[in-house]
A protein has these predicted regions:
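Iron-sulfur cluster-binding electron-transfer modules in prokaryotic oxidoreductases
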Residues: 1-182
Length: 182
């Protein structure tokens, strides 16, 4: 995807959605995020709808720093050229890399749980409650890596009975999934 293709969807989108390769491995995440955007009438463009765009982290881990820098520069240009105000990411790894490695000059970078919380608080998204018990696992990169603990819990507590896990927050146990499956 290049900047011209992204801009064709909306001249000045409110949001650019970047799913990331881990979300592409679990397509229901992408479908759910798009369902939320539709329900809240979010004007957005989908940066990596067809896959093929990477945040650069796998390249960094492989020691390919030059390729990682090129990827980051290309992504940065695409995002800045889109005219979006907010970049929403569903992959905690991508979220951390965009926060730490990208200089997006005034573009807000949010994990999708943070954005959903905002949509609910603004009254743009209505949640339906149920009687289900919900246990939330803090992903390493999102929790310990970026300090995002409360937003997911705020949203989940509005849709069900949020149950405290034996180990959560900084004490949460790593699932081992991060980039090990790539």
């Amino acid at each position: 995807v290049n900047a011209v293709e992204v801009n064709a969807a909306s001249q000045s989108p409110e949001v650019m959605y970047f799913a990331g390769c881990m979300s592409h491995l679990t397509p229901r995440i992408i479908k759910s995020v798009e369902k939320v955007f539709k329900a809240a009438s979010v004007d957005y463009v989908f940066a990596d709808r067809d896959g093929g765009i990477c945040c650069g982290r796998p390249l960094m881990l492989a020691g390919k720093t030059s390729a990682a820098r090129e990827t980051i520069a290309a992504n940065r240009k695409m995002i800045l050229d889109s005219g979006c105000k907010t970049l929403v990411l569903s992959c905690p790894i991508c979220y951390k890399i965009f926060k730490d490695e990208y200089d997006l000059k005034g573009i807000e970078i949010l994990h999708y749980t943070q954005y959903i919380k905002r949509l609910v608080e603004q009254g743009r998204l209505k949640l339906s409650a149920c009687d289900e018990r919900i246990v939330y696992h803090d992903p390493c990169e999102l929790g310990r890596g970026c300090g995002v603990y409360e937003e997911p819990r705020k949203v989940l507590s509005q849709v069900g009975n949020l149950v405290k896990a034996a180990k959560e927050g900084d004490e949460s146990i790593c699932c081992g999934g991060s980039l090990g499956s790539l």
